[in-house]
């Protein structure tokens, strides 16, 4: 378990050294344990726990089973622990068996393949008492409330792999699984290294685009007296009204409607300016801002997907990325 405050917005914090491990859950056979190391109280010795865990992870005879291995491997490395030997990820096994599932999180897979759920009652009750979110605020809870939940994570992952492994064999997908699973170390090193970006150039590009956008908006103000908000239909309607241009409305509510195609078909210069403002605004907010937001020490550590998952990926198995999507580039308006 971790304190990973910016996980949902910027991705796993281990690439940015943003957060830390609060405890480790381990399962073997039918047993499971939770070792708290960085809660606000009730912790075990971090040095002793990590010394034991390092020995366990270094044993190449032991197969290590994870659900979303890249996340755990990253945080373990951030704490100085390298995992050696065979690594299995149930998030690789699951989409091989069913690439059309809506969800691949542990609870969803456990429900469908094992007929069981993680019991979150104690965790949620404690979170409500302490006034924190049960997941993102877990680090603020005493270990006695987190331990049972964390142990379930580890034990269910082990049970799930036992179930999925049999189904993979039955479906004659073992060789494909081994191939996909063998990519794990490569994907991990790719994410760890990151993709180099020119942050200074990104800042300059943002500044230049903002200047052009502001200039176009000011031109429209001089012509119409309206400070246009390019993505707000009612605002664009005021500009059109000011120069006597007609426009479409939605059938249901009668609200103004300005699609990209409609604006492109207009010959009036002011419509062209609105199109340009939209293009510049999108380039800034969708591409440049994303680069600046996700960059750390001149690199972007995005998530790479070889298969489907809750975080992204494709049904066909085409390689993809997210947080941010590096394949998303402004092809028509470079």
Map each language-model feature to its residues.
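Short glycine-rich phosphate-binding loop at a beta-alpha junction
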Residues: 61-70, 227-229
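Conserved beta-strand -> loop -> alpha-helix junction used to position metal-binding or nucleic-acid-contacting
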Residues: 82-99, 105-111
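Conserved "right-hand" nucleotidyltransferase catalytic core of DNA-directed polymerases
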Residues: 1-40, 84, 101, 109-114, ...
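Conserved nucleotide-binding/hydrolysis micro-motifs of P-loop NTPases
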Residues: 70-73, 97, 101
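Alpha-helical scaffold elements adjacent to nucleotide-binding pockets in ATP/GTP-utilizing enzyme cores
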Residues: 52, 72-75, 105-109
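A structural signal for short, well-ordered beta-strand segments and their strand-loop junctions
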Residues: 64-67, 87, 178
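Nucleic-acid-processing active sites and adjacent nucleic-acid-binding tracks
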Residues: 29-64, 195
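Phosphate- and divalent-cation-binding pockets in alpha/beta enzyme and binding domains
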Residues: 71-78, 238-239
